Amino acid sequence: MAVEEIASRKDISLRDMQISAILKMLFLNKDLNNNDNITTITDDIFNQQEIIWKVLILDIKSTATISSVLRVNDLLKAGITVHSLIKQDRSPLPDVPAIYFVSPTKENIDIIVNDLKSDKYSEFYINFTSSLPRNLLEDLAQQVSITGKSDKIKQVYDQYLDFIVTEPELFSLEISNAYLTLNDPKTTEEEITGLCANIADGLFNTVLTINSIPIIRAAKGGPAEIIAEKLGTKLRDFVINTNSSSTSTLQGNDSLERGVLIILDRNIDFASMFSHSWIYQCMVFDIFKLSRNTVTIPLESKENGTDNTTAKPLATKKYDIEPNDFFWMENSHLPFPEAAENVEAALNTYKEEAAEITRKTGVTNISDLDPNSNNDTVQIQEVVKKLPELTAKKNTIDTHMNIFAALLSQLESKSLDTFFEVEQDPGSTKTRSRFLDILKDGKTNNLEDKLRSFIVLYLTSTTGLPKDFVQNVENYFKENDYDINALKYVYKLREFMQLSNMSLQNKSLEDGSDSAFKPSNLTLSGIYGLTEGKLQGGVGSLISGIKKLLPEKKTIPITNVVDAIMDPLNSSQKNLETTDSYLYIDPKITRGSHTRKPKRQSYNKSLVFVVGGGNYLEYQNLQEWAHSQLHNPKKVMYGSTAITTPAEFLNEISRLGASNSSNNDA
C-alpha cells in the first residue's frame, strides 16, 4: 500500500500518516507496500526488503518531529545505524549514504555543501522539513555546481512535516507565546503578519500530510481569519501547480470525503485553558510536565508554605510514554478514578500471567528464566518466547503505577479535587461560598490553582460574580503577595469579548454506551492500595465520595462549533447561527471568488486548529464527541500553535495584564 493510499484511509490516524511519510523518506522516498496495521510497517519492510544502511542527519526541529513518533529501534529497522545533529562534529563515513532531514535554512544548506565538498558521505539524500524557498534552492544549486560533485546528490525533497504529533490525532506547531504576541499592544503589524504566515505554513504542512484539500472555515475578526486567507491562497496555488489528474492529493470532491479545516481563535473559550480536569491525561499534563511523550515528575519539593508551581524541583524523574503504550492508549481519556482502577486490574492480570509461567517452568520468579536458554522442553520454549512481551507489559504498568503515586501525592498536598469540584457549578451561591472556604485552607502551595479556579468561575458564570466576592478574592491574593496581573486581562476580556462562547449551547454526551461516566466506588483509600505504600499517611478521606466528582459528560465551546459545522442536521439552532457567519474558503475553486456564503453540509473528517494555545481537555472532549453514539463516528484531528499548560498560559496573560496596565498609566 503506497503512503498516499495509507493517508486516505479513514481509520488511519494523523500520527500514522506522519509515521508513514517519515518511513518513506527513510527508505529513500520509495513507495512502501504494506497491508497490515501501520504500527507494524517497519517490521514488514525489515523482513521484505534488502536494507540499505544509512546515516540520518537532523537539526533540533526535525529531531523533535521524529522523536515524538519513532524510537531508536524503529530507526534501526529502517536502516539508520547512526543519527546525528547537523551542527555536531561528525566523523566522515565516505562509504555510507546520508539522509538529511533538516529545516530549509541558509545555515543548513551551507553545512550540507561543506559535507559534500569533503566527501563526508557516499551519497546525499536531502529532505527539508517544509518547503525550500526558491532563493535558497537556487543558492543550493549554485553551491553544489561549484563543487563539481553534483552526481553525489541523489534527491532533494520537500517533506512538509514541520509539525509535532504526540497523540493519534493531536499535533502542535511548537510556536510558543502566540497568544501573547497576537494580543500585545506592543506587537507590530509586521510581526503579526509574519506570525500568521508561519502558522499558515505549519497548517499547509499538516494538510499535505493528511493528503486531502479541505474546505476551510474560520472565525472572523481575528488572527484565525488572516491565517485562513493566507492558507487558502497557498493551497489554491498548490492546486493550480499540481496536475489533479495524476495526484491523489486532489482526489475526493465529496465534502464527506474531503473534510473541513476549522480555524478558531483562542478567545472562543478561555476557561478551558485554566480548568482542572479529572481526565488522566489532562491531569498528567497539568500537574507534571508532559512534553513529546515524556512525563517529568519532581521527586523533591520545598515544604508546604511556598508555591512550588514555578519553583525548580531539587530532582526529577522522567518516564517515557511509548507510542505503543497499551495502558495509555486505553486509559488516557478516562477519569482518574477509572484509570486508577484499571491499572490495578492490569497489575493483577500480569501477576496471573507471571504465576502461570512460574507454574509451567518450575522457577520461583520469572526473572530466573533465561531467554537465550536452549532448553529442549517445548513448553518452556513457548513460555520463554512470551518473556519479552510480558516484561514490556510489566514495565508499562510500573510506569503508570509511579505516575499515579505521584499524582496522588499532589492531589493530597494541594487539595486539587476541591478545585475540580467548584468548577462544575460556577453560577451557584453555594459554589462561591465553598470557594471562599478553600481560600482559607491555610495552604500556599496551591495559589496558582486557586487563581485558575477563580478565572474559570469569573468567565463561566452566566450572570457574573458579585463585586464583594471578587473583592474578597483579590484581597486574598494581595495578602499572600501573589501576582494577579492575569486578572486585569481576564476582566477586560470578559467585558469586551464577543458572546460567541456564551451563545453556544452545550450538548450532553451521555448515550448509554460503555464510554459514559459511571458511578465509582473507588475512593482514594482504594487508589492508595495501588501505590504499594509509596505514599505516607492516610488519604482515604480526600475524596471519599468519588462519584460526585464524575459529572455528566457534556460538550465544551470548541466541540459545539465542530458539532455545528460537521453535523448541522443534529446541532442546535444557537450553534448553527454562530457558525453560519464563519468564513468559508474552498481552495479548489481556482477561478472567480473562492469565498462564498457557506451552505450547511455534513463532514466525516475535520482538522480543528486553535490559534494561541491548545490543551488536552479540548482534545479529549472532541475525541469523545467524535466517537459518541450521537451520530456516525467522525474523525477529528486537533492542533494548535502550541499545546500549552495552564501555568504557561497564565504567564502569557499575566504579561498582557501588566502590559495593558503600563499602557493605561502612560
UniProtKB/Swiss-Prot annotation:
Main location: cytoplasm
Keywords per UniProt: Cytoplasm, Membrane, Protein transport, Repeat, Transport
Swiss-Prot/TrEMBL GO biological process terms: endoplasmic reticulum to Golgi vesicle-mediated transport; intracellular protein transport; positive regulation of SNARE complex assembly; regulation of Ras protein signal transduction; retrograde vesicle-mediated transport, Golgi to endoplasmic reticulum; vesicle fusion with Golgi apparatus
GO function terms (MF aspect): SNARE binding; syntaxin binding
Entries under Gene3D superfamilies matching the protein: 1.25.40.60, 3.40.50.1910, 3.40.50.2060, Syntaxin Binding Protein 1, Chain A, domain 2
Membrane topology: Peripheral membrane protein
Localization terms from the record: Cytoplasm; Membrane
GO cellular component entries: COPII-coated ER to Golgi transport vesicle; cytoplasm; cytosol; endoplasmic reticulum; Golgi membrane; membrane
Stretch list, region 4 X approximate repeats: 106-514
Pfam families in UniProt: Sec1 (PF00995)
Sequence repeats: 106-142, 220-257, 436-474, 478-514
Similarity remark: Belongs to the STXBP/unc-18/SEC1 family.
Function: Able to suppress the functional loss of YPT1. SLY1 is essential for cell viability. May interact indirectly, or directly with YPT1.
Quaternary state and interactors: Interacts with SED5.
Remaining remarks: Present with 5780 molecules/cell in log phase SD medium.
Official protein name in the record: Protein SLY1
The species this protein was found in: Saccharomyces cerevisiae (strain ATCC 204508 / S288c)
Gene symbol of the encoding locus: SLY1
